[in-house]
Every structure is written in structure tokens, then in C-alpha cells.
A protein has these predicted regions:
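Acidic, polar-rich low-complexity tracts and alpha-helical solenoid repeat scaffolds
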Residues: 1-205
């Protein structure tokens, strides 16, 4: 992989490099750093490709994969990568911070790093509670709080979920044209509204 990195660095070292070959070189450079566990460098290289694609410098064919791998690179860091992502993104004027935190959260959840997942999802909610996939993040938060046996906190969060996604909410007004996302929101509300009285009943018993 070191030889590949050296070769890709030579190709990507030209500021005016554009087009499909440049995109592939950028992507594979990031991939090579990821494969040798240099996760922060990999994340930066994926970021460079995404920003270039968004600016029209490179084709965006690999953008979704690059977002996933950038999130994976951060989440593979000690501590789940949320703090490193925050530090890196602090002075960056990009529109995909919410998407990155969502993906970092899901990557951490997939690896049973639950505290780190919640940290990332809460960061997402802090910067954009109207994010299109916010309902899935909120469902994950409730699931994790239950796994952590934080039952009171999970119950309190269910009320937040119901309020966040009702038909009068800012989230709904922004995302109502996306049926799959609305379905996720309705599922989150339905689950919360079923569990709220069950928990209250169990507490009173």
C-alpha cells in the first residue's frame, strides 16, 4: 500500500488535475491510507475528493462511497472519531457535516460503540435536527439508551421524538416530500407512542 500511496500522491499532486482519472486517484489514495490504518489521513483525503466533486472538479460517481469511508475512517479512531471530526470540520464551510455525523454514528452503532454512537447522533441533532435521516438516528438513540439500561432517559427522549416529527414540526415541513423519510419518522413516532404508556404503566405497578 505504501507504493500505491507514493504513486497516487504523484498523480494527485497537480493542482489543476481534474476529471475521472483524477477522481479515481484521489479516491484510491484515501483508500490506501485507510488500508494501512492511517485513518485521520484517509478521512482528510476522502474529504478532499468530496469537496472537489461538489465543486465540479471531479466526477461525483464515488461520492456516496467516499462519504461512507470518511465516516468509517473517523469511527475507527480511538474514541469513535466524533471529537476528531469536530476539530477537523470546525473551520470548514461544507454542507455535509450533518450527513457525516449521521454516518459516524451508524458506523459506531454497528460496532457496538454505543456511547460514541449517541455522541455522534447528538452532534447531528445539535447542528441540524431537520436532517433527512434524523428519525433513524433518534430511533437508534432510544435503542441504545435501553441497551444501556438508561430507562428514564429513554422515556424522556421518546417525548422528544414524538414532538420532533409530528405533522406541525419543522422537520416534517422540510422533508414531507420524501416518502421514505416520512415513513421512518412515522415509525419513530409510533414506536415512541406505544412505549411511553407501557413504561409509565410498568413504573406505576
Amino acid at each position: 500500500f505504501r507504493d500505491a500511496i507514493s504513486a497516487y500522491n504523484k498523480v494527485t499532486g497537480f493542482q489543476n488535475l481534474t476529471g475521472k482519472e483524477a477522481a479515481l486517484a484521489m479516491y484510491h489514495l484515501a483508500e490506501s491510507y485507510y488500508n494501512i490504518a492511517e485513518f485521520e489521513t484517509a478521512a482528510v483525503k476522502y474529504f478532499d475528493y468530496i469537496v472537489g466533486a461538489d465543486a465540479g472538479k471531479y466526477p461525483s460517481d464515488l461520492r456516496a462511497e467516499a462519504m461512507d469511508f470518511m465516516a468509517a475512517a473517523f469511527s475507527d479512531l480511538e474514541g469513535g472519531g466524533v471529537e476528531e471530526a469536530e476539530t477537523f470540520l470546525k473551520d470548514k464551510k461544507v454542507s455535509f457535516k450533518d450527513s457525516l455525523y449521521y454516518r459516524i454514528g451508524m458506523k459506531n452503532k454497528d460496532h457496538d460503540r454505543n456511547e460514541e454512537a449517541v455522541q455522534s447522533f447528538r452532534r447531528l441533532m445539535a447542528i441540524n435536527p431537520n436532517y433527512i435521516d434524523a428519525p433513524l438516528a433518534d430511533i437508534a438513540i432510544v435503542e441504545i439508551l435501553i441497551l444501556q439500561q438508561k430507562f428514564d432517559e429513554a422515556q424522556e427522549y421518546r417525548y422528544t421524538v414524538v414532538k420532533r416529527y409530528d405533522r406541525n414540526s419543522s422537520w416534517y415541513k422540510k422533508n414531507q416530500q420524501y416518502p421514505a423519510s416520512v415513513k421512518n419518522a412515522e415509525s419513530a413516532i409510533r414506536s415512541a407512542m406505544l412505549d411511553i404508556p407501557q413504561y409509565d404503566h410498568a413504573q406505576a405497578a
